[in-house]
């Protein structure tokens, strides 16, 4: 064995990789291995050639830093350098003053614009939302990471991130609490008010949900404040505020399903879109509720959720269920939820603890302290609980007395069955409605007290009681109308004809009672508290009176005419807020004109 190889074997394990290669190894592109600070290396020693090292080092590739154009885009107005903004970090102030990657805002943090940049020869790739930070108020959650910059810019340009001034937000939220929240108490008002009104550090809400709340509050807000916002009419304000929330939903800005579900329930209050009406948004809400398993009782499975979270889920579920039933009763649209799809227990008073705001938040909203009394909370909670129980009966009535038919290629509506149900089934459902009415507590009984309400709490409770009885009377009308109008007997029972006459009388009684309630609310200035489901109730009652006035047999024609006129005045008062009221008024006007000319 040559000596060189013996040396190689002897040196094996003591050699180290060279920090700099010799000229021979560099030319042959070999690895240069030698002792520290000693020559020759192993390769040169084995080949018996000179080994020398020149002072040449491989230069490290310098990292590419930000170019001047990007550095300029990172600066805000005033020449100060913008620090990286963490979208999940809570700012110290209520509004931001700078945005990363060239987006800037004003003091309110709602209007954003992009600084001018010199265009390059090639379009730059759009970064994802993970490298983009939109400046939003501190009380709303940050920008999701999955949205592209072009999507966020489009949302910003269309005003999806624009919020009303703080004072107008206060009035909008107050309007929501007084008119919408008692009808659908799915919001955790304590968290919402702590974030938006009190600006508590660490409290945030969803931008999508906040925009939806702004839209719902604009339905009942005083027109003076709508004009201060720059809108010429309530319809324009509702359309604009709804459009902002709809853009955020369609672009997937919100990722938390509960916020999306709450917003979808508020979307059902918008009726002007023919393609995406209340029934469409209700279907979206039901699909999302199934996705998160809202229809299941989590008490039957071991979960790590607190009692307040379980109460919130129950309230949210029954709001979805009740809204589905009331929309089916009002618009004849097909129900999305079947009675066998859920096993959530009925609500209790303990489930409503977190749906009321704190006293400090109510004072900031200039709301009466009576809204936080135990009596007010109990009355509003019981009203919704009994409305939920009535909604279960509404589903049974619609499934038994009506069948689904196609009104158009994209619309399915309820129509009376060609053959009514048997007399025993009919009497069973009527008995269930009577049991529901007799089980009402004293503070929800009918008729309403004659004394007009004075405080805000009394007005809200009074209006909610009135709406509850209007829904009950509308359900009676829906139960008896197919039975009284059917010409085919279902059995040979001699009492069947008498029950048909009784059904006709109950329809007339229910219609007259609906108009009396609406007239009384109109006389004391509470028409503004009526929900959208009051419009179909008024329409069915007025149609009954039109038929009665046009019949040959008239009982108290003057009283019928007075009820009709008063119902018409109440319907006119709802035209500004609801598209349904405008269509109903046009239908009544066309019907009366046709009867006069015919």
UniProtKB/Swiss-Prot annotation:
Disruption phenotype: Has no significant effect on the synthesis of 2-oxocyclopiazonic acid, cyclopiazonic acid (CPA) and their biosynthetic intermediates. The keyword DNA-binding applies. It is found in: Nucleus. InterPro entries: Fungal_Detox/Toxin_TFs, Transcription_factor_dom_fun, Zn2Cys6_DnaBD. Keywords: DNA-binding, Metal-binding, Nucleus, Transcription, Transcription regulation, Zinc. SMART domains: Fungal_trans (SM00906). GO terms for molecular function: DNA binding; DNA-binding transcription factor activity, RNA polymerase II-specific; zinc ion binding. Its main location: nucleus. Residues 22-51 bind DNA. GO terms for biological process: DNA-templated transcription. One of its GO terms (cellular component) is nucleus. It comes from the Eukaryota. Transcription factor; part of the gene cluster that mediates the biosynthesis of the fungal neurotoxin cyclopiazonic acid (CPA), a nanomolar inhibitor of Ca(2+)-ATPase with a unique pentacyclic indole tetramic acid scaffold. This is Transcription factor cpaR. It comes from Aspergillus oryzae. The lineage of its organism: Eukaryota, Fungi, Dikarya, Ascomycota, Pezizomycotina. The gene is cpaR.
